[in-house]
């Protein structure tokens, strides 16, 4: 009776579509299957003996936590790890386990697109719920503010002692400040006037406005796609969105300065708010600042969340609201030395 030849472990690993690495406790690579070589853009010979972090611009894996789990005799899994190599970002699911010979087997699988889309939709729903809650509170605050201000005005007219007017003035000024904050929290409630024209007109207005604020050590670079089709949009609202993002980039660079790139591209076959579009406009704002702190990234679009001292945390929340009204989306990637916001606006189905 004929028996089939059993494949060895090397053949199995070489045939896997997931990236497999064998690393030691110093994270030096001892084996990389073909999928891992393709991911890391290096041959097996060049990878051998090289510590994994040296090959990457950024790797969000919590290596200390992984090593603690392995030392405790447990496996380790992180379902959303960002890996950046040669300027390309990959979202991976990473699993690690200790082998009998003491080596660490690291398996890296691309995050399933459907699962990633579901996570994005859930996160967006949570952000919308948070925004609606803040708006409800803002409405409740705004109503008594009007009464407070009106009462202070009447009181200022009735006070016999002019020296007391200073107190009513403070009340009125603070009521106005709170009302302005509430108006910003509420944001635009209705779609504005749409026109069909090149998005580059808005981009150029933003460049003109921001150029007046640029210090000498910051470069603003334009990288436009001249073939980008015209699209229907509210120029004032899109200008506000891009201004918020570009100014955030400028503030993130700080006194050290750096570079901001305003880029436009055509995106193809994109799903936005459950609708499939053959064409969409992509507007990127990229900077080489310190990056967004990891603890802020999941809640960055929530109202009142800011990584900047003195910031209100409203700019990105309002920006997402405006882009939602255009049936578009905003997403970002960030690691030390790189942050990129991408705005997608539909052109045609």
Swiss-Prot record:
Binding positions for ATP per the UniProt entry: 329
Catalyzed reactions: ATP + protein L-histidine = ADP + protein N-phospho-L-histidine
EC numbers for this chain: 2.7.13.3, 3.1.3.-
Highest taxon of the lineage: Bacteria
UniProt keyword DNA-binding present: no
Compartments where located: Cytoplasm
A GO CC term assigned to this protein in UniProt: cytoplasm
GO molecular function, one term: protein histidine kinase activity
Maturation and modification: Autophosphorylated.
CDD domains: HATPase_Glnl-NtrB-like (cd16918), HisKA (cd00082), PAS (cd00130)
Residues with the Phosphohistidine modification: 139
Histidine kinase domain residues: 136-349
InterPro entries in the cross-refs: HATPase_C_sf, His_kinase_dom, HisK_dim/P_dom, HisK_dim/P_sf, PAS, PAS-like_dom_sf, PAS_fold, Sig_transdc_His_kin-like_C
Positions of the PAS domain: 5-78
Activity regulation statement: The phosphatase and kinase activities are regulated by the nitrogen regulatory proteins P-II 1 (GlnB) and P-II 2 (GlnK). GlnB acts by binding to NtrB, leading to activation of the phosphatase activity and inhibition of the kinase activity. Binding of GlnB to NtrB is allosterically controlled by the small-molecule effector 2-ketoglutarate. At low 2-ketoglutarate concentrations, GlnB interacts with NtrB, but not at high 2-ketoglutarate concentrations. Uridylylation of GlnB also prevents interaction with NtrB.
Role according to the record: Member of the two-component regulatory system NtrB/NtrC, which controls expression of the nitrogen-regulated (ntr) genes in response to nitrogen limitation. Under conditions of nitrogen limitation, NtrB autophosphorylates and transfers the phosphoryl group to NtrC. In the presence of nitrogen, acts as a phosphatase that dephosphorylates and inactivates NtrC.
Name this polypeptide is given: Sensory histidine kinase/phosphatase NtrB
